[in-house]
UniProtKB/Swiss-Prot annotation:
Residues 116-130 have a biased composition (Basic and acidic residues). Tropomyosin, in association with the troponin complex, plays a central role in the calcium dependent regulation of muscle contraction. InterPro entries: Tropomyosin. Residues 1-284 form a coiled coil. Keywords: Coiled coil, Repeat. This is Tropomyosin, muscle. Belongs to the tropomyosin family. It comes from the Eukaryota.
């Protein structure tokens, strides 16, 4: 009987210890589950941030593409303006050369006009002195008069050419000034776009770094989840084992309690039989 009681007490203690271990395992499972939920929540937050970062990255790439396109368009316009300026410079050079030639022709015509005027004055003087001049003098006067008309025509043509060239030169200078203004405006716009492109590029690099860090954090969280899941599975296995041990011990305790009840009943029956025997012996 004492051995059975000691065994039952030992098994109860073992049962209590098993229950404590099961409770501890359940508490650990609960803690691990809570930690896993927190990690999963952090992972969801990180994924949301990554999604936002990817959206920001896409927008930055679109802004970069738009800025690059604008820059290329402005560079194209500046190249066209520079080509126009170069063409106007060539045209102005040609007009300046033409103006120089016109001035040279005007100078020659003026010299001829002065010479013809001088000859006319000389002829007029001679004509007045020699009223009865010869036919040769008259022919000379006609020649000089023809030279005078030619010189006047040349002078008028030179003046007309000079005015035309001067007018064209003024137009070209105005066109050149406007083209230079457009080229300067285009260059200023290119500087602005290059600065904007630099800012967008820096933002893009920052977003790429943020995305890389977010990916690293996601990998770290996934590794933590795998580790915690493994620990959770291990804890659940230990909890199941502890629960099976408790059930097994409970069955053993129940069996021993049944055996104890049976032994008590036998002890009672034997005691009653002994009492009855003693009473019978006492009657004799």
């Amino acid at each position: 009987m004492d051995a059975i009681k000691k065994k039952m007490q030992a098994m109860k203690i073992e049962k209590d210890n098993a229950l404590d271990r099961a409770d501890a395992a359940e508490e650990k499972v609960r803690q691990i589950t809570e930690k896993l939920e927190r990690v999963e929540e952090e992972l969801r937050d990180t994924q949301k941030k990554m999604m936002q970062t990817e959206n920001d990255l896409d927008k930055a790439q679109e802004d970069l593409a738009a800025a690059t396109s604008q820059l290329e368009e402005k560079e194209k316009k500046v190249q066209e303006a520079e080509a126009e300026v170069a063409a106007l410079n060539r045209r102005m050079t040609l007009l300046e050369e033409e103006l120089e030639r016109a001035e040279e022709r005007l100078k020659i015509a003026t010299e001829k006009l002065e010479e013809a005027t001088h000859n006319v004055d000389e002829s007029e003087r001679v004509r007045k002195v020699m009223e009865n001049g010869s036919f040769q003098d008259e022919e000379r006067a006609n020649t000089i008069e023809a030279q005078l008309k030619e010189a006047q025509m040349l002078a008028e043509e030179a003046d007309r050419k000079y005015d035309e060239v001067a007018r064209k030169l003024a137009m070209v200078e105005a066109d050149l000034e406007r083209a230079e203004e457009r080229a300067e405006a285009g260059e200023n716009k290119i500087v602005e776009l290059e600065e904007e492109l630099r800012v967008v590029g820096n933002n893009l690099k920052s977003l790429e770094v943020s995305e890389e860090k977010a990916l690293q954090r996601e990998d770290s969280y996934e590794e933590q989840i795998r580790t915690i899941s493994s620990r959770l599975k291990e804890a659940e296995t230990r909890a199941e084992f502890a629960e099976r041990s408790v059930q097994k011990l409970q069955k053993e305790v129940d069996r021993l309690e049944d055996e104890l009840v049976h032994e008590k009943e036998r002890y009672k029956a034997i005691s009653e039989e002994l009492d009855s025997t003693f009473q019978e012996l006492s009657g004799y």
